């Protein structure tokens, strides 16, 4: 065996090292067919703390270089501490045993004389790691036990080699869309999943991002995306210029550019076609008969080009938001989200996830009794339930009735199951709702429409029994089949009607959903314009408006600011009575045919509850 001089590779930069002895043994493996004739196995032993008997049994016990009076320097590679310009006094360390390509005799060598020279020429390279790089430390040397056998060392080397050879079989890293589903494809018939409605992606896997569904090509989507980006850059540049030219005032008037843009939009909307020609109608009918619901209807010439362009931008933005959610893993194929619900004579598409039990959520389609709100798994179960269900209206007390419209007050403590089912149903259409099961501290006001089959759910709102912040609404919902018919405003009006009876000033609990915020702003605007239309005095008080309408003063001020009716002049706050807005509101009220979509205070039979 050849024995050379070598420093341990695991020594620290300050010149300290472990004084372990390592002996490399050479072995011949004749069973391998690849021609490998030698393998090295490193066996660790105890270091300077070995007893004298073990030193006597060492194979190098008779070497003259191991004198106890003259310690020797071990050779090693240059470390960071030795590369510094300041001279370092060399320390002396006990000589280590290793293999050398030179003579078989050992000698003490001063490392300070050979700090730029390698100590030995190795006849074979060190074993490779699974990544193909040589080990830089003692990571591949087992120092846990001094009695490691030779067979275990060979087995370890073989496992390292096998693990390195298996790396080529690892699957490639998936990119982009493959990161959330590898086998997805667009559900539109005839679509190859190429392109995206936003023009920013190469592939799509949903109808919302399908160019073919929107009667476009992938190239057209890219051109539109470039046009949108260019318009956004121009708008941002113009906003910066406006900000630089403006002075900091409390109420900033519109700039000249904004006024010109408003006039331009008004002119573009005047160019709207009065109607479709006969050829266009035939073209639209042919398109509908050919593709049915698998393609978007043709939208050209239905409205002005400006409004159609706004709609296309909104579509692209919504598609981009959905794509981000999919890439983040929030929307995945096969996720436990109910897609549709069978509710009475309607089939409703859901908007958000609701925490129904897993055995129901995984179905994708839920069947629900529209009277007791019990949810079921199949049409057969629903049919059997409807045959024996005795409920035809919500539980609780009917506190309002005018015509076919009724409102029921349901106590969450007395009718816990019904209120929990109502909250789970509402979560399918509300994003910010967090109340599902703790319904006892709340009262629910359910609005229904009656016919010969029963009282059908229109919507509801809930409120705390004891609200310290005077919230008159905690959650409000209008069912999708009754939206855009005035029922949402009726629910809001009814909540303020209850506040008037309680002689309180109320406000909805925040945050509001997007549709809820639109409804409340429209209601506050209507209330203020009606009040100003009937007001004949010269001085007005926000507090008086609040007490008469039961609207919170903060909501009144924000609405006046949005209408540009609140000004600050010569140290005083002024409310401008804009007659143009009042006349516009009067004209809209005259055109409304559904005058019955209002709440009549005389039809309310209710007294405020005392305590809980």
UniProtKB/Swiss-Prot annotation:
A zinc finger (CCHHC-type) spans 177-220. The keyword DNA damage applies. Phosphorylated at Ser-51 and Ser-54 by ATR in response to DNA damage, promoting its ubiquitination by the CRL4(DDB2) complex and subsequent degradation. Phosphorylation at Ser-51 and Ser-54 by ATR in response to ultraviolet-induced DNA, promotes localization to DNA damage sites. Phosphorylation at Ser-58 by PLK1 during mitosis seems important for prereplicative complex formation and DNA replication licensing, and requires prior phosphorylation at Thr-86 and Thr-89 by CDK1. Phosphorylated by MAP2K1, which accelerates its degradation. One of its GO terms (molecular function) is histone acetyltransferase activity. The modification N6-acetyllysine is found at residues 200, 278, 433. It is an enzyme of class 2 (transferase). The keyword DNA repair applies. Residues 43-58, 135-146 have a biased composition (Low complexity). The active site is at residue 509. Zn(2+) 2 binds at residues 369, 372, 385, 389. Histone acetyltransferase activity is inhibited by GMNN in the context of a complex with CDT1, inhibiting histone H4 acetylation and DNA replication licensing. It is found in: Nucleus; Chromosome; Chromosome, Centromere; Cytoplasm, Cytosol. A zinc finger (C2HC MYST-type) spans 366-391. Pathway: Protein degradation; proteasomal ubiquitin-dependent pathway. It comes from the Eukaryota. One of its GO terms (biological process) is internal peptidyl-lysine acetylation. Residues 1-174 are annotated as: Disordered. It holds the Pfam family zf-MYST. PROSITE patterns: MYST_HAT, ZF_CCHHC. Acetyl-CoA binds at residues 476-478, 484-489, 513, 522. Component of the HBO1 complex composed of KAT7/HBO1, MEAF6, ING4 or ING5, and one scaffold subunit: complexes containing BRPF scaffold (BRPF1, BRD1/BRPF2 or BRPF3) direct KAT7/HBO1 specificity towards H3K14ac, while complexes containing JADE scaffold (JADE1, JADE2 and JADE3) mediate acetylation of histone H4. Interacts with MCM2 and ORC1. Interacts with the androgen receptor (AR); in the presence of dihydrotestosterone. Interacts with CDT1. Interacts with MAP2K1 and CUL1. Interacts with p53/TP53; leading to inhibit histone acetyltransferase activity. Interacts with MIS18BP1. The C2HC MYST-type zinc finger is required for interaction with MCM2 and ORC1. The N-terminus is involved in transcriptional repression, while the C-terminus mediates AR-interaction. This is Histone acetyltransferase KAT7. The lineage of its organism: Eukaryota, Metazoa, Chordata, Craniata, Vertebrata.
């Amino acid at each position: 065996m050849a024995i050379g001089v070598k420093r341990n590779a695991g020594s620290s930069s300050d010149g300290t090292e472990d004084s372990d002895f390592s002996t490399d043994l050479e072995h011949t493996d004749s069973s391998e067919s690849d021609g490998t004739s030698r393998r090295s196995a490193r066996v660790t032993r105890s270091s300077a703390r070995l007893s004298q008997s073990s030193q006597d049994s060492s194979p190098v016990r008779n070497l003259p270089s191991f004198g106890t009076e003259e310690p020797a320097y071990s050779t090693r590679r240059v470390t960071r501490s030795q590369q510094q310009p300041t001279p370092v006094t060399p320390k002396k360390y006990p000589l280590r045993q290793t293999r050398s390509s030179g003579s078989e005799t050992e000698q003490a060598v001063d490392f300070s004389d050979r700090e730029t020279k390698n100590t030995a020429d190795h006849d074979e390279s060190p074993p490779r790691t699974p990544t193909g790089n040589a080990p830089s430390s003692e990571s591949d040397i087992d120092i846990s036990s001094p009695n490691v056998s030779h067979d275990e060392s060979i087995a370890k080397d073989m496992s390292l080699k096998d693990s390195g050879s298996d790396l080529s079989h690892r699957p490639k890293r998936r990119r982009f869309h493959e990161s959330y589903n590898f086998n997805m494809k667009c559900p539109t018939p005839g679509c190859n999943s190429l392109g995206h409605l936003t023009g920013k992606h190469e592939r799509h896997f949903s109808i919302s991002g399908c160019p073919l569904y929107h009667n476009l090509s992938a190239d057209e989507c890219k051109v539109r995306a470039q046009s949108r980006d260019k318009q956004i850059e121009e708008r941002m540049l113009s906003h910066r210029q406006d900000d630089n030219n403006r002075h900091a005032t409390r109420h900033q008037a519109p700039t000249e550019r904004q006024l010109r843009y408003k006039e331009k939009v008004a002119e573009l909307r005047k160019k709207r076609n009065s109607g479709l020609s006969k050829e266009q109608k035939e073209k639209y009918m042919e398109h509908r008969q050919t593709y049915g619901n698998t393609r978007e209807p043709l939208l050209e010439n239905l409205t002005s080009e400006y409004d159609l362009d706004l709609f296309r931008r909104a579509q692209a933005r919504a598609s981009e938001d959905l794509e981000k959610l999919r890439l983040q893993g929030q929307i995945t194929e096969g996720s436990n989200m109910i897609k549709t619900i069978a509710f009475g004579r309607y089939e409703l598409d859901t908007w958000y996830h609701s925490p129904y039990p897993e055995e129901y959520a995984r179905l994708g389609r839920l069947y629900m009794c529209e009277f007791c709100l019990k949810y079921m798994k199949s049409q057969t179960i629903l049919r059997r339930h409807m045959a024996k269900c005795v409920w035809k209206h919500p539980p609780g007390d009917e506190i309002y009735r005018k015509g076919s419209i009724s409102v029921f007050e349901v106590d969450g403590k007395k009718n816990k199951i019904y209120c929990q089912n109502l909250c789970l149903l509402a979560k399918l259409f509300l994003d910010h709702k967090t109340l599902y099961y703790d319904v006892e501290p709340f009262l629910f006001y359910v609005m229904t429409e009656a016919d010969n089959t029963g009282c059908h759910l229109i919507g509801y709102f809930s409120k705390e029994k004891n609200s310290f912040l005077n919230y008159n609404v905690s959650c409000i919902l209008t069912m999708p089949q009754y939206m855009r018919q005035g029922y949402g405003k009726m629910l809001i009006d009814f909540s303020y009607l209850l506040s008037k009876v309680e002689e309180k000033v109320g406000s909805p609990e925040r945050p509001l959903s997007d549709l809820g915020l639109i409804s409340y702003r429209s209601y506050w605007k209507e209330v203020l314009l009606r009040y100003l239309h009937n007001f004949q005095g010269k001085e007005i008080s926000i507090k008086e408006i609040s007490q008469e309408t039961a609207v919170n003063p903060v909501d009144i001020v924000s609405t006046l600011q949005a209408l540009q009716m609140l000004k600050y002049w010569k140290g005083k706050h002024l409310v401008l009575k804009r007659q143009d807005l009042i006349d516009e509101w009067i004209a809209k009220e005259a055109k409304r045919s559904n005058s019955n979509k209002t709440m009549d205070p005389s039809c309310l039979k209710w007294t405020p509850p005392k305590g809980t």
